[in-house]
């Protein structure tokens, strides 16, 4: 980010004196100096000597290829790119969000030695923004046909392999984390239209390898995983994610593999048939494809949505319905025990549900809601429909069931009330819900019996059971006890003793719920043990989610804000009912294992009672036979019922080339998707074996990749003097996997089991971009951010007015964010201000040596001792910098793809230069600093080595 920076002066320090006892950090220092990534002592503060260029630490320019420096450094950095002297590096092409880096060059296109290379080694002449002018599609009206001579596999270029020396690129160029995956290079005629939208974008559907090995031996030799990541929905609400819809209910599917027609098929036999791109079978083209039944006119076939877009949604005919569309049902199961009353949880939840009633999807007016209060008894509520005549109006009544051994659901009407027809009575109940139990002193919570009763109530319809609890279940079936954390935390048997389910009831019950089309979501909020490891089985097997709020109390406004926003977002999310996901692959490719929150109904069918919008799924693939075709295809289909009662199928199609050389496979490997794969496998090992095994698996997998690359793809063997080389498109993989071992889910040492279990759940269900944030937090330097940061991006909009004139007007875009810096204390100045985004929380780190003017602008005080630290919010002050800072925080918090809201933790650094922060506050800040600094994953945190040390260890192992 270029631009002017606010001139907050730095404190002046003697050149020979280290700051805040941390020593000066840096690269190329004298032997006695503290080096990059060395252990940081939280109580000692942050290193103080600012490095040259520390505000922009070795970040790639937006237009640089993998591993390349910014534009003004290109002349110095050519050697690091491994580009021939007569080649010039090209800008990184910013692929639109709707495309997969799909390149469809002309058949037989060579790569002349003097031709410029694109960002991944693909010739710039066929880069996406130029391809429409380069391709020159010709041939039959509906694309290439198999009746014609097909280009040989070698006739189109693969991504070229460029290597990087990781030890020479420190700090690692974290801007690479924002790059798209290596482009998928397909031959001319691979799609019907040649448009980028013909192949699924990586946001929806991506493969760990954008060139797939042609046999299993080559895959095993590569040590790279083969899997696809499916993320069918990008936003919580339909209006934020317009996906093309096929509305005429005309669906053409392959007779053999049952895949759906898509832009990557081929028309043959004078366009009367289409050849499946998965199994190669020829199918008849439906007669209605060329005819509009509404206008009774012949139409252009190529105008059909499913032939132009790889991500589409079909409105399904009645043949796709097992039963009539059911209404959307929300059954709220609320903890009414004394603890939930005393900490304000029950009152907060009831008020939030009341305020969110208008946001519940109810387009067709059929949504229903019900409520069950739970202590040692079950409290049901009959909610009559509203009446305009007060004389005929019925009141809401509460029915109590005390027998927990054989729970009988009352045979009363209106236990599930229609939201639209009973709106007033529902509001009255929620307004008075707390008063029903305000004098309750019952400390017990019978969750198991409540779940069974709720299941009986809605199992004929399906829907959601949303559980709000602040108490460990301790009555009836499924009662849990507190585990011995002290004896097992941080030890070899931690997984089996603390992270495994403590009662088999919850998993078996979850499977029954899945069969009945019932999803269970958990909102757990307490200052005491909740047994997240056991209770999270309910959402895991019913396609729900676990939400965890440790140390929650209504006495803190920030806690109320977070819980309320997340409940509201959850209730406003468009959900799909009675859904199944199936992923198909070309001949020779088998879907081998499935990861995510769902239940495997059969070997290749994943069942979702309700399909969430904020999760993703990973499918591991095996190669069962030698692949002779030049291309492989995958197709994911989600059959579901919308919240407004329409049966639909969302279809995503992805095609990738087949390679027979190891360099082709490595040059097209997707480091983020591979990280996702290894994360799922590590979670699996942590739960089935041990945390030690999970960490060893990650380290061993990475070492295997380095060994293969050195042995097979690096020219020559220089022994101990050889650099640590890896291809450019994988050079962030070591950083990500090493950082993953320091994440709270895997780090060694004592971690509360609820926190660790919750972190494992997040890793196992989060989309890639959020997952990467958990593993490698984003840090923004705020005290020196450019003047445009914190303000809306200045854009222009062009339109034609009523007079037919073209008009261009300025409009505001998104808030501009500063460029991220590396996760290391070497780049944190003691006078600086930094925002750390961990994915779950935000940390505003205030350097202990911050100048008074900065403190005044941000907090309205000139002494750090007066700053409200911990969970807090910035005060709204009447100055530009404060407003920009709040804009940055709000922008980071935004997310149309997630329900979570991040609390802000204000952390004050330590200083030896003045005594602005009293000793009592310094003691309070120590654990907060430890928590904040645990996200500096390039340093020695979380019981692990610094990143530089880690790379040197790998280098030594490779040389031994």
UniProtKB/Swiss-Prot annotation:
Biological process per Gene Ontology, one example term: COPII-coated vesicle cargo loading
Region (Disordered): 1-110
Polar residues: bias regions: 52-61, 76-102
Composition skew (Low complexity), residue ranges: 27-39
InterPro entries listed in its UniProt record: ADF-H/Gelsolin-like_dom_sf, Gelsolin-like_dom, Gelsolin-like_dom_sf, Sec23/24_helical_dom, Sec23/24_helical_dom_sf, Sec23/24_trunk_dom, Sec23_24_beta_S, SEC23_SEC24_subfamily
Topology within the bilayer: Peripheral membrane protein
Role description: Component of the coat protein complex II (COPII) which promotes the formation of transport vesicles from the endoplasmic reticulum (ER). The coat has two main functions, the physical deformation of the endoplasmic reticulum membrane into vesicles and the selection of cargo molecules.
Protein name: Protein transport protein SEC24
Organism this protein belongs to: Komagataella pastoris
Gene name, Swiss-Prot/TrEMBL: SEC24
């Amino acid at each position: 980010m270029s631009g002017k920076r606010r001139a907050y002066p730095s404190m002046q320090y003697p050149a020979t004196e280290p700051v805040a006892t941390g020593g000066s950090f840096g690269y190329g220092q004298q032997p006695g100096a503290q080096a990059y990534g060395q252990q940081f002592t939280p109580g000692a503060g942050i290193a103080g000597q600012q490095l040259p260029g520390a505000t922009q630490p070795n970040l790639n320019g937006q237009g640089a290829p993998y591993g390349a420096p910014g534009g003004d450094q290109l002349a110095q950095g050519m050697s690091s790119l491994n580009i021939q002297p007569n080649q010039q590096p090209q800008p990184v092409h910013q692929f639109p969000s709707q495309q997969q880096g799909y390149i469809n060059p002309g058949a037989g296109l060579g790569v002349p030695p003097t031709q410029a290379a694109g960002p991944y080694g693909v010739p710039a002449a066929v880069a996406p923004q130029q391809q429409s002018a380069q391709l020159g599609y010709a041939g039959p009206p509906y694309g290439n046909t198999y009746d014609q001579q097909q280009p040989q596999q070698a006739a189109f270029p693969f991504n070229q392999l460029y290597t990087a020396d990781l030890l020479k690129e420190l700090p690692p160029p974290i801007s690479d984390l924002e790059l798209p995956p290596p482009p998928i290079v397909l031959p001319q005629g691979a799609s019907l239209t040649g448009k980028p939208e013909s192949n699924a974008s990586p946001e929806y559907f991506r493969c760990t390898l954008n060139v797939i090995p042609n046999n299993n031996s080559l895959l095993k030799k590569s040590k790279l995983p083969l899997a696809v990541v499916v993320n069918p929905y990008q936003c919580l609400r339909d209006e934020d994610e317009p996906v093309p819809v096929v509305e005429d209910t005309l669906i053409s599917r392959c007779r053999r593999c049952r895949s759906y027609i898509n832009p990557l098929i081929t028309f043959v036999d004078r366009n009367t048939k289409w050849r499946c791109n998965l199994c190669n079978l020829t199918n008849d083209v439906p007669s209605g494809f060329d005819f509009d039944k509404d206008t009774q006119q012949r139409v252009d076939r190529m105008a059909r949505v499913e032939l132009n877009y790889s991500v589409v949604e079909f409105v399904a005919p009645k043949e796709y319905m097992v039963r009539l569309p059911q209404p959307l049902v929300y059954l709220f199961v609320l903890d009414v025990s004394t603890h939930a009353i005393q900490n304000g949880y029950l009152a907060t939840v009831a008020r939030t549900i009341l305020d969110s009633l208008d946001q519940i999807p109810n387009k067709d007016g059929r949504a229903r809601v019900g409520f069950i209060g739970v202590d040692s008894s079950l409290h049901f509520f009959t909610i009559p429909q509203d009446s305009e005549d007060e004389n005929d109006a019925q009141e809401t009544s509460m029915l109590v069931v005390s027998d927990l051994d054989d729970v009988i659901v009352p045979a009363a009407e209106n236990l599930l009330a229609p939201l639209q027809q009973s709106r007033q009575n529902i509001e009255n109940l929620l307004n008075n819900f707390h008063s029903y139990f305000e004098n309750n002193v019952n400390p017990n919570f019978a969750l198991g019996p409540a779940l069974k009763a709720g299941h009986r109530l809605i199992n004929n319809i399906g829907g959601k059971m949303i559980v709000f609890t602040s108490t460990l279940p301790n009555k009836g079936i499924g009662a849990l006890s507190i585990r011995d954390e002290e004896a097992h935390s941080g030890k070899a048997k931690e997984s089996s003793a603390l992270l495994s389910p403590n009662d088999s009831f919850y998993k078996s019950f979850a499977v029954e719920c899945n069969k009945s089309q019932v999803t269970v979501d958990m909102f757990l909020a307490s200052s005491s043990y909740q047994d997240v490891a056991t209770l999270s089985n309910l959402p895991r097997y019913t396609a729900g989610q676990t939400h965890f709020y440790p140390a929650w109390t209504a006495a803190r406004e920030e806690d109320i804000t977070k819980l309320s926003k997340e409940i509201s977002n959850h209730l406003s999310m468009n959900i799909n009912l009675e859904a199944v996901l199936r992923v198909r692959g070309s001949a020779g490719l088998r879907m081998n294992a499935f990861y995510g929150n769902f239940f495997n109904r059969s070997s290749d069918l994943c069942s979702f009672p309700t399909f969430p919008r904020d999760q993703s799924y990973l499918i591991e693939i095996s190669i069962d036979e030698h692949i002779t075709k030049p291309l492989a295809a995958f197709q994911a289909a989600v059959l579901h019922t919308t919240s407004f009662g329409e049966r639909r199928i969302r279809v995503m199609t992805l095609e990738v080339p087949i390679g027979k050389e190891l360099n082709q496979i490595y040059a097209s490997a997707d480091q983020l998707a591979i990280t996702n794969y290894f994360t799922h496998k590590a979670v699996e090992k942590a739960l089935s074996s041990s945390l030690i095994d999970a960490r060893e698996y990650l380290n061993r997998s990475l070492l295997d990749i380095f060994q293969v690359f050195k042995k097979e793809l690096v020219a020559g063997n220089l022994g101990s003097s050889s650099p640590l080389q890896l291809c450019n498109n994988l050079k962030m993989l070591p950083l990500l996997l090493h950082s993953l071992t320091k994440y709270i889910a895997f780090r060694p040492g004592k971690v509360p089991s609820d926190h660790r279990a919750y972190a494992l759940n997040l890793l196992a269900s989060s989309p890639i971009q959020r997952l990467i944030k958990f593993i490698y937090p984003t840090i923004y330097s705020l005290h020196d951010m450019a003047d445009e940061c914190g303000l809306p991006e200045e854009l222009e909009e062009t339109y034609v007015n009523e007079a037919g004139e073209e008009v261009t007007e300025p409009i505001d875009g998104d808030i501009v964010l500063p460029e991220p810096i590396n996760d290391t204390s070497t780049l944190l100045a003691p006078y600086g201000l930094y925002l750390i985004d961990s994915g779950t929380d935000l940390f505003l780190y205030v350097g202990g040596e911050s100048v008074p003017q900065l403190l005044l602008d941000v907090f309205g005080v000139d002494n750090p001792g007066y700053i409200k630290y911990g969970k807090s919010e910035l005060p709204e002050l009447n100055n530009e910098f404060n407003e920009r800072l709040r804009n940055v925080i709000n922008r980071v918090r935004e997310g149309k793809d997630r329900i979570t809201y991040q609390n802000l933790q204000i952390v004050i650094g330590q200083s030896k230069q003045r005594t602005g922060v009293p000793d009592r506050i310094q003691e309070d800040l120590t654990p907060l600093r430890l928590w904040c600094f645990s996200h500096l994953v390039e340093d020695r945190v979380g019981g692990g080595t610094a990143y530089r040390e880690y790379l040197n260890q790998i280098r030594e192992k490779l040389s031994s």
